[in-house]
């Protein structure tokens, strides 16, 4: 009985007053005293590349007595929280703002542990690996096969009703003469060199009738499904959406017939092949299901496939009364969350460029930069993507002063990464970014540290920059001083 209950009993002897349990309070051993609808639990944050607060952010949180916050208290990190009334789990862009410093330390420890678990090592599938399906056991000498070939050759435009009817007749007729398994018949049809598109579709449409009956081996069923995909790729450049919908419906119906999960029984190579197939068909829903199954095995698709998935998420939309509209940022980040282990160690240039537009706060940009510079492809990223980081951070805020501070922080990180020298390919980008934000003094400091080759271009940009958004910080005098400095260097 709680302390409140015992106190109430003392006030009213002989009566028992039960104080209802607060269903929103989470056990202290889980993550602290803060209800989820105020601050999300550490393991409910689903950001794909922001692992946890860096050292500077952690220090700022823990030394701020009143109202410590991350991301300036703005809703940035996608997270699942429990609704304060319905208690339903809801995806939101959460505000990480605390009333006091009291519970911050525990929360920071838990998000750090959660991030370490999330960003574990995974095995990346090779892009040139693929499933191999054994040849059918049926041979051309079989009387059954000869009769089946004659039928298929004379029916190139085959419906599944006709195929089903003919298979039943042939199977019954030859059953007493030779041992024939129905799954071998389907495999034989799909492996024929002169297979037609109608025959290919009819084979899959006929299959569910026999699953759980004549075909009750889930491994054999998976072999047939993969062979159907491989045969389809020989017939088309890409399997179309109706055919993929048919395949997914067969997978779902087979699960019910066999009372087994078809997807979880696929081996890693088969699962990766299905993911790649639905990805090429731009089916984001099924692709995500297959990707999460791979991730649960600590397996990831090839890096080109991952890049294609990120692009697909970026294009994803949802149906509304007003038609199809783009998915919200929080939903897209949630769809990318499963790729966190890849971003932690195998971030590529293409991935970096695709993820940058999701950054709406400088902490996200620097979190992505940290992963980029730790990646095994860091040299390529540093060579190709730094200017995109500069462009993104230079336009992040309305305040030219705030933008300048962020540009300077990025400049010194890149300088440290390159052992004290910013590459010329990036130097001009930093200078133009600072000029765009009217920070003329910082430009002069940079050029004093490291001369710039395109001095004429810098002078031209300075002359064109006449807008001062901030009421303080940068002035026209600074601009004239810089022009004089540059003209002396030209």
Curated annotation (Swiss-Prot):
List the keywords (alphabetical).
Mitochondrion, Transit peptide, Translation regulation
- Pfam families associated with the record: AEP1
Its protein name is ATPase expression protein 1, mitochondrial
Annotated localization = Mitochondrion
Keyword Nucleotide-binding carried by entry = no
Principal localization reads mitochondrion
Q: One Gene Ontology cellular component annotation?
A: mitochondrion
> Which species is this UniProt entry from?
Kluyveromyces lactis (strain ATCC 8585 / CBS 2359 / DSM 70799 / NBRC 1267 / NRRL Y-1140 / WM37) (Yeast)
**Family according to the record:** Belongs to the AEP1 family.
Residues annotated as transmembrane:
none
Which InterPro entries does the entry mention? Answer: Aep1
Q: Which domain of life is it from?
A: Eukaryota
Question: What are the recorded GO MF terms, alphabetically?
Answer: translation regulator activity
- Function field: Required for translation of the mitochondrial OLI1 transcript encoding subunit 9 of mitochondrial ATP synthase.
């Amino acid at each position: 009985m709680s302390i409140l209950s015992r106190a109430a009993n003392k006030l009213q002897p002989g009566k028992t007053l039960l104080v209802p349990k607060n269903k929103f309070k989470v056990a202290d051993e889980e993550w602290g005293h803060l209800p989820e609808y105020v601050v999300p639990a550490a393991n409910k944050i689903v950001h794909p590349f922001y692992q946890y607060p860096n050292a500077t952010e952690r220090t700022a949180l823990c030394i701020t007595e009143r109202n410590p916050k991350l991301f300036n208290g703005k809703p940035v990190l996608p997270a699942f929280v429990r609704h304060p009334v319905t208690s339903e789990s809801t995806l939101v862009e959460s505000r990480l703002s605390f009333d006091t410093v009291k519970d911050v330390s525990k929360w920071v420890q838990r998000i750090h542990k959660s991030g370490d678990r999330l960003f574990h090592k995974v095995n990346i599938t090779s892009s040139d690996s693929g499933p191999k399906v054994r040849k059918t056991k049926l041979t051309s000498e079989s009387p059954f096969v000869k009769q089946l070939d004659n039928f298929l050759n004379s029916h190139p435009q085959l419906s599944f009703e006709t195929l089903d009817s003919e298979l039943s007749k042939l199977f019954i007729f030859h059953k007493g003469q030779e041992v024939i398994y129905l799954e071998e018949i389907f495999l034989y049809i799909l492996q024929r060199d002169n297979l037609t598109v109608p025959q290919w579709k009819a084979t899959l449409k006929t299959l569910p009738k026999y699953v759980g009956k004549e075909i009750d081996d889930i491994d054999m069923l998976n072999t047939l499904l993969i062979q159907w995909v491989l045969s389809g790729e020989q017939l088309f450049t890409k399997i179309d959406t109706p055919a993929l919908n048919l395949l997914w419906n067969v997978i779902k119906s087979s699960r019910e017939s066999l009372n087994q999960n078809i997807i979880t029984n696929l081996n890693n190579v088969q699962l990766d092949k299905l993911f790649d197939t639905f990805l090429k068909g731009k089916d984001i829903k099924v692709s995500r299901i297959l990707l999460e199954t791979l991730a649960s095995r600590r397996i990831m698709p090839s890096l080109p496939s991952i890049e294609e998935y990120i692009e697909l998420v970026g294009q994803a939309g949802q149906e509304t009364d007003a038609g199809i509209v783009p998915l919200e940022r929080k939903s897209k980040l949630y769809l990318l969350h499963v790729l966190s282990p890849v971003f932690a160690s195998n971030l590529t240039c293409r991935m970096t460029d695709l993820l940058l537009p999701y950054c709406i706060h400088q902490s996200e940009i620097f979190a992505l930069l940290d992963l980029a510079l730790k990646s095994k492809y860091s040299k390529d990223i540093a060579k190709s993507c730094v200017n995109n980081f500069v462009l993104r951070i230079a336009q992040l805020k309305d305040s030219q002063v705030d933008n300048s501070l962020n540009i300077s922080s990025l400049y010194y990180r890149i300088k440290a990464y390159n052992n004290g020298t910013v590459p010329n390919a990036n130097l001009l980008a930093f200078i133009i970014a600072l000029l765009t934000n009217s920070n003329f003094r910082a430009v002069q400091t940079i050029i004093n540290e490291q001369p710039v080759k395109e001095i004429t271009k810098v002078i031209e940009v300075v002359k064109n920059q006449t807008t001062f958004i901030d009421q303080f910080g940068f002035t026209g005098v600074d601009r004239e001083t810089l022009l004089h400095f540059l003209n002396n260097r030209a």
